[in-house]
Design a protein with these regions (language model features):
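A residue-level detector for the "anchor" residue at the start of short, highly conserved motifs
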Residues: 1-186
Length: 186
């Protein structure tokens, strides 16, 4: 059983959509939001999770999450998630190759179609990363705040490393930060 969304509110000044709960329905309905190149957008999902969407990003999400089951969204591009804690259900972000499994945390998930990898940068909390075509026996890589999990499209390997999270999340504030980067990487 799910909470039906009776309406949503669009705030043009803050570029935010806020969904409001009302009555219950039995099936999950999905919306897809595509952010044009050169723009960013913010959306508050029905469970209270806040998502900042970067330029050229697409997200598919349920109008309302089904109670006591995984809260799944599907991402192509880059987004920063501030996940609302819910002990009864995990929050799962799925992309082309990988997925992030969280309970309540803040992280950046990047998976543009033209990249040869996806990466998840954790700023707060804890989360697990695994390949998308996973089976339960596939290893779940746990990352901690200040760490990045990088999933290779070619090999499916997940590499973990320490990073300065501000470099990866500065786009939320409209800034671009470069530190010791080659011109070809920019």
């Amino acid at each position: 059983e799910t909470d039906n969304i009776e309406s949503f509110q669009l705030n043009k000044n803050t570029k935010t959509i806020i969904y409001e709960k009302s009555q219950k329905v039995s099936s999950i309905k999905y919306n897809t939001l595509k952010v044009p190149c050169g723009k960013t957008f913010n959306i508050n999902l029905s469970d209270g999770t806040n998502v900042y969407l970067n330029s050229g990003t697409s997200i598919k999400f349920p109008v309302s999450f089904k109670k006591e089951s995984d809260r799944e969204v599907f991402l192509s591009g880059e987004a920063y998630f501030n996940v609302q804690t819910n002990n009864a259900s995990r929050f799962v972000v799925k992309s082309n190759l990988s997925s992030a499994i969280v309970f309540g945390t803040k992280f950046n998930f990047k998976d543009y179609p033209e990249d040869s990898f996806s990466e998840i940068i954790l700023t707060e909390g804890s989360l697990g990363v695994r390949k998308l075509e996973n089976t339960e026996k596939d290893k779940l890589v746990i990352i901690k705040p200040g760490e990045r999990a990088k999933v290779s499209f070619e090999t499916g390997e997940i590499n973990r490393s320490r990073v300065n999270t501000k470099i990866y999340t500065s786009w939320i504030e409209g800034r671009i930060v470069f530190r010791n980067e080659n011109l070809e990487n920019m």
